[in-house]
Design a protein with these regions (language model features):
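An N-terminally biased module of ancient metal coordination in phosphate/nucleic-acid-related enzymes
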Residues: 1-111
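Internal, well-ordered alpha/beta segment that forms a basic, Gly-enriched binding/recognition surface
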Residues: 91-138
Length: 138
């Protein structure tokens, strides 16, 4: 048992970070290298209390690969202690969620479209690609 006199420490996490490789992102100006440099600089400029980020690029893992490369091969993102891959799945139908319309009939509810976020341990991206993304059925 660890008898650390400090006890618990609280850190801020942002588990919904979209990279320039995401379908939706805010980095559109410049060459691909310039766009990535701006993105990485923004991550490095996060307030010091942010220690964990989740790279969330829908059903793609390429942005996570690139951020890991910056952290571990280029020695960047020293302010970030942990980078987690997050896969976001958008379901256009969510079974069993209905509401009654004005005539008393079942109709789709406002909850008929939801997003699922699957947060993985900081795994090798190839494991996630092969064992999770590769197993998704169309």
């Amino acid at each position: 048992m660890n008898n650390d006199p400090v006890g618990s420490t609280w850190k801020k996490w942002d588990l919904h970070v979209h990279t320039p490789m995401s379908i939706v992102h805010n980095y559109r100006r410049g060459s691909p290298d310039e766009v990535w440099e701006a993105f990485l600089r923004d991550l490095e400029a996060l307030p010091p209390e942010f220690k964990v980020i989740g790279i969330n690029d829908y059903i793609f893992i390429d942005g996570y690969r690139r951020v890991r490369q910056a952290k571990f091969e280029q020695n960047r993102l020293k302010n970030i202690e942990l980078i987690l891959p997050v896969i976001e799945l958008r379901l256009d139908k969510f079974g069993g969620v209905v509401k009654k319309d004005q005539d008393g009939r079942d109709s789709p509810s406002d909850w008929n479209r939801i997003n699922l976020h699957v947060i993985f341990d900081a795994l090798d991206p190839e494991v996630i690609q092969q064992q999770f993304i590769g197993a998704l059925a169309p």
